[in-house]
Amino acid sequence: MGPQRDITRRLLVALVASGAAGLVLAAPSAASTECRAGHGSADVVGKPGPVVAWRAALSSRVPTHTRVPGRKKTRRAGTARTVGPGDAPWLLVLRAKNDRKGRCWVRVRLPWRPNEAGAWVRAQHVNLRPTRWRIRVNLAERTLVLHRGRRAVLRTSVVIGAPITPTPQGLFSIVGVWRWNPADFLGSYILPLTAHSPVLQEFGGGDGRVGIHGRGGESLLAPLGSMASHGCIRLPNGAIESVVRRVGAGGLPGIPVRVR
């Protein structure tokens, strides 16, 4: 995160203030309500793997559960109790299973704290779609790699969090896609993640959400390969533009982002 800037706060303000910047969403189509979706080798909805992962599209708010309901009494997950497209239009599917009645449930990555929070939702309440895209961030090497299946299609050096404000590690997903001013500190695109700073509970008026974004203005002073941000992952504008162009703005929300 740049100096005195919080991605969540800036994005919301910008969306209200200007029609030029906006969240680009994919339009959900016909839903798959089965744990087996019938897409060849990826027909079984399950955990993210090296070849395919699954995204769950939200068209309305749905209840979340800490476990798949069965004989034991269950409670809804977290304080929000429901998750909707205003939180994240697409959620990363972590696994799937059937309940005692044969109904399919999917465990999804939640877009709020704590990091790597997850909950179960009914598969019939979401649209399930496979994706072959994933992103891996190597903190030791200061690199980001975009994969399509097992093939790496883009590799770039990045700026990561400073030692006192480290980039969080874990399995996250992209929340949205924002086109931005290339000359601004945040560069040409911003991809907010489900990740939050492990040390900054709030930042610049927001909740310390971490994202992937470009570089411009003062952020160019920190060279690629350095540890200088408040947790965000900074790419060259050309690299993040290539990510958006290759995957498509509608295909990015919900794809897995592994940071380690």
Question: Model segments located where?
Answer:
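N-terminal secretory signal peptides that target proteins for export/translocation
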Residues: 1-8
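N-terminal export leaders
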Residues: 9-13
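Bacterial N-terminal signal peptides
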Residues: 14-24
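Beta-loop motif signature
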Residues: 33-99
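Boundary regions of SH3-family modules and the immediately adjacent low-complexity/disordered segments
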Residues: 33-52, 109-137
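Exported/periplasmic cell-wall-interacting domains
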Residues: 34-35, 112-114, 125-134, 162-171, ...
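SH3/SH3-like beta-barrel superfamily modules
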Residues: 82-125
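A structural motif detector for short, solvent-exposed N-terminal "entry" segments of globular domains
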Residues: 123-162
